[in-house]
A protein has these predicted regions:
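Glycan-recognition and catalytic cores of secretory/periplasmic carbohydrate-active enzymes
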Residues: 1-220
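Single conserved hydrophobic/aromatic residue that forms the stacking wall/gate
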Residues: 221-230
């Protein structure tokens, strides 16, 4: 998953043929191996050595945030390689994982899930984490920008409202990282072993870039419509 993103960041430093092969390999592993049609198009975290599903805690472990994050990497690769069908597939997969992982009772996206609906091994499974929601903001707004699917915009607005109203500290800098299932601050710490200066600035920057593009497009469309007397 990370290699999908890294490939685009360092492709100007390495041989073009090597990078294209690397991108193709990454796309295949994510979209043809870990994405499982028999699970309705959901993405799993762990497989047997022969790429079959395994029925154990690790094999049933689902991480909606990871899958949704991976999909905006794939969208970027699809754009770079001029493969619109890949962009659409990544967008559709992101929406499936989002609908799957969304907590319909309290809102927010579950941290971990079990694909068979069994109790997850991880005790923190029902927490709501900052990075999961930030990466989802990127995926949904990129999906809307690249495909025009209104579902992406609807989800972006829903996730945006949840994220800014729950994770942002209104009194002090930096965001909270860990909420309980009800969306209440579980840990007041702003940094630690797993929460560093990465997901938040990258996420805000990525969203800003896409929203700037959309803003320019809207201004251009409005200007053209005015010129035509619409």
């Amino acid at each position: 998953m990370i290699l999908c993103n890294l490939a685009l960041e360092i492709e100007h430093l390495l041989d073009e043929d090597f990078m294209v092969k690397t991108m193709d390999t990454c796309i295949h592993e994510v979209m043809d191996v870990f994405l499982r049609p028999e699970l309705g198009g959901l993405i799993v975290e762990t497989l047997n050595a022969d790429n079959t599903l395994v029925d154990c805690f690790e094999g049933r472990h689902m991480n909606p945030g990871h899958a949704i994050e991976a999909m905006w990497f794939i969208m970027d690769l699809g754009k770079r390689l001029n493969r619109p069908e890949l962009v659409v597939k990544a967008k559709d997969t992101a929406l499936k994982m989002l609908e799957y992982g969304w907590d319909k009772e309290y809102g927010g996206i579950f941290y971990f899930m079990d694909r068979n609906g069994c109790p997850p091994q991880e005790l923190e499974w029902d927490q709501k984490l900052w990075w999961v929601h930030i990466e989802t903001l990127i995926s949904t707004i990129k999906g809307y920008r690249l495909t025009g699917d209104p579902k992406c915009l609807e989800w972006f607005e829903r996730i945006h409202d949840y994220t800014w109203s729950h994770f942002k500290d209104t009194e002090h800098p930096e965001w909270f990282g860990y909420l309980n299932r009800r969306g209440e601050v579980l840990l007041p710490l702003k940094g630690g072993k797993w929460k560093g200066c990465f997901h938040l600035p990258r996420g805000l920057y990525q969203c800003w870039q896409v929203l700037e593009e959309l803003s320019k497009y809207c201004l251009l469309y409005t200007s053209d419509a005015a010129d035509e007397g619409l």
